[in-house]
Swiss-Prot record:
This is Probable cytochrome P450 313b1. It holds the Pfam family p450. Its EC number is 1.14.-.-. It is an enzyme of class 1 (oxidoreductase). It is found in: Endoplasmic reticulum membrane; Microsome membrane. Belongs to the cytochrome P450 family. The lineage of its organism: Eukaryota, Metazoa, Ecdysozoa, Arthropoda, Hexapoda. May be involved in the metabolism of insect hormones and in the breakdown of synthetic insecticides. One of its GO terms (molecular function) is monooxygenase activity. Keywords: Endoplasmic reticulum, Heme, Iron, Membrane, Metal-binding, Microsome, Monooxygenase, Oxidoreductase.
Length: 502
């Protein structure tokens, strides 16, 4: 009996200490009131379904004036979806670290630029940044044009000659991943011609595993997670993806391992030159200089390939789908393409830069269907958040969710046509001036996506090559599409499209 009383007393004291240590979070939660969660799991039960997560957060933002505080597990979660607050967070030197929830991704795919924290992120960004410079990207155009030709042949054979309605997203993913492997790793994989479905299923499975864990607070402790079926699925898909990355890296690893002469290494580095410094060449040099380890290279390669192909193929697909659902804008795009481009053949950089309306239709699709619907940051120091009715202290350790998807659809920011596809109204010359952070498909500020120029160039070129020669249509309607929350935006069902030669 006495032992039970003593144990109960200790548990009560521990609970009171836990509450006292978090008093600053409770204070800001009182000021920025949001939904009240359950003890220990917070809003986990309400948010656990990825298929309704974005719609649920949109409903909360209408019920509570954002920014507001919610809870995921025991983590204090600041939700923002207005450009003014987003600007403050993305430009803050105290919010450059990704949210704590990204540790679930780094434990699965490695600690690369997308998931890492300072000072590791600063060091790796500085070392890898030259691989995504403008001059390097212009050297990728022959690869992009070659992959565009493969894409057109696929559309011609299956869509036109065989008359099949196509699930274009699956075709695009193979094209974009092929381009990513060639331009970052220097290796051609022929995804369109071999049985590579397991790679794409593994990438899709990995993102679903990470999101399910993020939305399930009871799986946050590693002790519990490692005994779950979700962890076993993670191990399976990670094994496939790590094998794929090792296949890409193996030739480079072998060359470096065999070349132990420092003078010979320096000579080879000078011969390669900066003009050919693609990602793998950059990191190879850093390994030879002792600035990166091969584990760093594996992590960065895994994350770079995954992020490049996932976000780019998603944005490109939604652009094509929006144009298929809105033939009037597709015809305006075609008019620009026949005016600015030759009737066939490759597209060069100068021609690509003249395609202003092409860029508009891409931006409008990324506004309506943000490739990465939500990004997370973590406050590593106390910060002051300004709102219309005053300033609020956001305590160190607060997790910050930036809801890009719903912000870019908000009628208070984008007007009455915010949930319609209308490139002219939102990005045309006569469109209203908007906050600089109202449109952030690649984020902005101190941790802007390193590959945004790469994605823009590849999307513009593929889109131009497709719609110069083909017309795409679908029976789907914009209001019928059901999106799912994921690392990159997904649809519950992918509509089929019909392809016709012009």
């Amino acid at each position: 009996m006495l032992a039970s009383i003593i144990l109960s007393g200790w548990l009560l004291l521990a609970w009171l200490y836990f509450l006292w240590s978090r008093r600053r979070y409770y204070k800001v939660a009182w000021q920025l009131r949001g939904p009240i969660g359950w003890p220990l799991i917070g809003m986990g039960l309400q948010m656990m379904n990825p298929e309704t997560f974005l719609q649920y957060m949109d409903g909360l933002s209408r019920q509570f004036k954002a920014p507001f505080i919610s809870w995921m597990g025991t983590s204090c979660f600041l939700y923002i979806n207005d450009p003014h607050s987003v600007e403050q967070i993305l430009n803050s030197t105290h919010c450059t670290n990704k949210g704590d929830f990204y540790r679930f991704m780094s434990s699965a795919i490695g600690d690369g630029l997308f998931t890492s924290s300072s000072p590791r992120w600063h060091k790796h960004r500085r070392l890898i940044n030259p691989a995504f410079g403008r001059q390097i990207l212009s050297n990728f155009l022959p690869i992009f044009n070659a992959e565009a030709e493969v894409l057109l042949q696929k559309l011609e054979l299956e869509g036109v000659q065989h008359g099949k309605r196509l699930e274009i997203y699956q075709i695009l993913k193979k094209i974009v991943l092929e381009a990513a492997c060639q331009t970052t790793m220097g290796k051609k994989m022929n995804f369109q011609h071999d049985g590579s479905l397991c790679i794409f299923k593994a990438y899709n499975g990995l993102t679903e595993v990470c999101v399910k864990r993020m939305l399930s607070p009871w799986l946050y402790p590693d002790l519990i997670y490692r005994r779950s079926g979700l962890f076993r699925l993670q191990q399976k898909v990670v094994g496939i993806l790590f094998g794929f990355i090792e296949q890409l890296l193996e030739p480079i690893v072998s060359v470096v391992a065999a070349n132990s002469n420092p003078d010979q290494q320096r000579s080879e580095m000078e011969m390669r030159g900066k003009s050919k410094a693609i990602f793998i060449e950059q990191v190879r040099e850093h390994v030879e200089r002792g600035q990166l380890s091969w584990q760093d290279v594996r992590d960065e390669a895994n994350v770079t390939i995954a992020a490049t192909f996932e976000t780019t193929s998603t944005a490109l697909y939604f652009t094509i789908l929006c144009l298929a659902m809105h033939p009037c804008y597709q015809e305006k795009l075609h008019k620009e393409l026949v005016t600015e481009l030759p009737p066939s053949g490759d597209i060069n950089l100068e021609q690509l830069q003249r395609l202003e309306y092409t860029e508009m239709v891409i931006n409008e699709a990324m506004r309506l269907f943000a490739p990465v619907p939500m990004v997370l940051r973590s406050a590593d120091q106390d910060i002051q958040l300004k709102r219309g009715d005053g300033e609020f202290l956001i305590p160190r350790g607060t997790q910050i969710g930036i809801d890009i998807y719903n912000m870019q659809r908000d009628e208070r920011v984008w007007g009455p046509l915010s949930r319609t596809y209308n490139p002219d109204a939102h990005f045309g010359l006569d469109s209203p001036q908007r906050h600089a952070f109202a449109f952030v498909p690649f984020t902005k500020g101190l941790r802007m996506c390193i590959g945004y120029r790469y994605a823009q160039m590849l999307m513009k070129l593929l889109l131009a090559r497709i719609f110069r020669s083909y017309r795409i249509s679908t029976e789907a309607r914009l209001e019928e599409l059901l999106v799912k929350g994921n690392i990159s935006l997904k649809l519950k069902d992918y509509p089929l499209c019909r392809v016709e030669r012009r």
